[in-house]
Amino acid sequence: MADAATLFFISLFGIVVKQHEAVFETAELAFSCAAFFGCCWALTRPYWGSALAGFACGASILCSNLLVGATVLVGCLMSHILVRGIGDTARKIFTTVAVAFITFGLWPLVAYLLAGVVAGDYFNLWAQRQIQIVGFFDPQEILWFVKHFIWYLCPAWPFAFWAIWMWRKNLTITHIALPLSFCCAWLIGFILSSDVAAETLLSVTIAPLCVLASFGLMACNRSTKSMLELFSVAIFTLALTGVWAYFIAWTLGFPPKMHWSILRLTADESVSHAHWTAILLALVLLVFWLYLCVRRLMRRPIRFWTGPWLSASGITVLWISAVCLFGPVIDSNRTYANIAREMSQELKTMHYVPGVDCVLAQTLPLSERGAIEWHSNISLTASESASCRFVVTHVSAKAQAKNPTKMAPGFVVLKSFRPRSDTRYLLGPAGPVLIEKQL
């Protein structure tokens, strides 16, 4: 059962989408899984497991927001109440809540000790933001959930629903009630969230959903298990075929339509130059996948988790192959290195002094400013009180094309931009940006 649940977790389509980026959803998923594991551990070690669950709840607040942490905490408390195990229920609940409060409380405590002057104002703003999050759910998030949950939670969700159906007359049994507690907590959090994406809250349900799916898989007949196996073979074989076809088109320039679609995703990498070791690794993985497919088609497996194994192997092979073959495309599509490089060159012509001068960038979000600073020696700030000699702002390429304008003296529009983006960067001396219409 543990093997099947782990393989279902690896094979989920949704979690692989953002795992290549340094985003908070990865930490949020890890702490949600830790909270679920703590509740499972509490069945045999009631207070150590409850303490781990409480720590994970507090850490979820620190890495995400108060609503996500409260949602995970509600799931833990519901599991303590509904699932019978050793230890006093009240003490387990108290342990979980206390450890969660202590874990979260370390943040404001250290902040007030080290920066007490500004900590009060900061946490007032933080509290206002958390209040804005709580409300009635956004109907647009329901549309997102209806459109995406089928592939986002594939292939686990059909087997999870089957497990609930098979044990529908005895939902209080441990292996059903415990994961269902977290799923119900997610539903409560989704209803009470007005400004949190449904995708963000779905991380709370991934681990319990995989556990439910493993029990549902065990309850399936042989033909249903074979459907998952053949589905995995067909889907990932087609996907790998597409990956290699696009790589060949990117390398040889044929077929032209496929080649053009790849060029649209990248600003600088017009010619494939994947490293030979990456290509060799992708070829080895392709041979490994074909071996798994042939072996499955030639033999009838006796292990009931063969379907999740094929699905997990397929998505792993597919993702590593895509990264190996299209690493330059992925980098150039997501990076700000080329923008930062050109901005640094233009500022040098404007006599920018590193370490002394700064660039006012009020229209650029914090993540964008941080990425540009990382790839250059430019100091960007959004503070109005800063005395900067230079300014950078966003302009629309479509608007400039429809309404040609003459820029104020000293201003330039950077030629570098992110692929398929309408945003361009206007750089020049600080002061009012005067734009005159061309006659």
Q: What annotation goes with each model-predicted range?
A:
Residues 1, 22-25, 147-148:
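Extended, compositionally biased regions that are outside compact catalytic cores
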Residues 55-56, 61-200, 208-211, 215, ...:
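Transmembrane-lumen/periplasm boundary regions of multi-pass, lipid-linked membrane glycan transferases
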Residues 28-44, 209-212:
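Specific aromatic-rich, kink-prone transmembrane helix
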Residues 20-25, 191-206, 327-333:
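Membrane-interface catalytic loops of GT-C/OST-like multi-pass glycosylation enzymes that act
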Residues 35-52, 56-60, 217-220:
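Membrane-interface transmembrane helices that cradle and orient dolichyl/undecaprenyl
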Residues 282-295, 303-432:
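Short periplasmic/luminal acceptor-recognition loop of GT-C membrane glycosyltransferases, typified by
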Residues 14-28, 65-66:
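Short acidic/glycine- and proline-prone juxtamembrane loop motifs at membrane-interface regions
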Residues 1-11, 29:
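Transmembrane-helix signature of polytopic, membrane-embedded enzymes
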